């Protein structure tokens, strides 16, 4: 069978790589893909943009694609699933209405409140003066979020009143995020440890994937501005078996049932960005309606089941009978980005050393392309993610960083401490 993966990032390379391992798959089409998917076994890039729904639909029909997997949020919010369904094609992802869980933070917060799912207190504002008054009343630290899609960057954690006021003004009157910032959600700052809890959902049932923890800040020690994510590891030790049970009971199940109750059943990858407090109580920071990036890369390294079998079960509404097998070893992925990311990065630089990466690490491509000479060049902010398995998180970290050592181009940089929380825990446990 032929499978289509929509997207061009590290997440899509990891999904295509895992899908290509299935004996049931003859070819994986990736639209538009990157330099990694261009050379991955059984994969072929097709130059169609993720927001070209007509082109994607025509491709799936022309190539007799058996099923389509959507990587990024943009085509989901635009309604790619609705278009494919209308044409009678099999596709895994939420409808445009269900994708509002990510497409609008106000929609998500109202949904959480309506269904009694734990989250931070919040208010939605469209007027600068009212928003500023609310911020002054609540005090800091406080979180200001652009309502719409902002590629993971429309969130300001304000530690001072001046920062909060600047964020409100930037988003509402300065138009820092265009239409995405025409409304802002202002919410309480949550204390605790973050975890990414991703489930496959078939409309009625949820099958949890391995947990993971992302590193959002650009700098070591979680400093500097937020990014789309600088690295991740799986599993997240903060999600103990007890916390896992609570998340399923208090967050995932009520979300699946709540979407049914609202007449918008959810099918797809449901990503709950959680804050776990000192007592193990989870609160939802945000929903994404697709697999995380860079979490997908280490999570796919650990998945031992045939992903195609799971996708088929999800599309057929049969996840209650499905089971996912995981490598017990932890995995860790480090993003190599291009300066000055998260500001507009330098692109078009030739990436050297990819052929010298040891077999113990897997390089997933994100913002890469092939130039006219067939060389791999940088083409985005987050360029590569080097991932590895290990007997411990520290071991996986060591192998991943050894794996990225030969890779270089002049604007390249990465954090040196991905996995630091889990490694501190491991050291503590060893006494």
Curated annotation (Swiss-Prot):
Signal peptide region: none
Assigned keywords, A-Z: ATP-binding, Ligase, Magnesium, Manganese, Metal-binding, Nucleotide-binding, Purine biosynthesis
Domain ATP-grasp: 109-316
Protein's pathway: Purine metabolism; IMP biosynthesis via de novo pathway; N(1)-(5-phospho-D-ribosyl)glycinamide from 5-phospho-alpha-D-ribose 1-diphosphate: step 2/2
EC number of this enzyme: 6.3.4.13
Binding-site residues, Mg(2+): 286, 288
Gene3D superfamilies: 3.40.50.20, ATP-grasp fold, A domain (3.30.1490.20), ATP-grasp fold, B domain (3.30.470.20), Phosphoribosylglycinamide synthetase, C-terminal domain (3.90.600.10)
Keyword Nucleotide-binding: yes
SUPFAM superfamilies linked: Glutathione synthetase ATP-binding domain-like (SSF56059), PreATP-grasp domain (SSF52440), Rudiment single hybrid motif (SSF51246)
InterPro entries: ATP-grasp, ATP_grasp_subdomain_1, PreATP-grasp_dom_sf, PRibGlycinamid_synth_ATP-grasp, PRibGlycinamide_synth, PRibGlycinamide_synth_C-dom, PRibGlycinamide_synth_C_sf, PRibGlycinamide_synth_CS
UniProt catalytic activity: 5-phospho-beta-D-ribosylamine + glycine + ATP = N(1)-(5-phospho-beta-D-ribosyl)glycinamide + ADP + phosphate + H(+)
The name this protein goes by in its record: Phosphoribosylamine--glycine ligase
UniProt keyword annotation of Nucleus present: no
UniProt family annotation: Belongs to the GARS family.
GO terms, molecular function: ATP binding; metal ion binding; phosphoribosylamine-glycine ligase activity
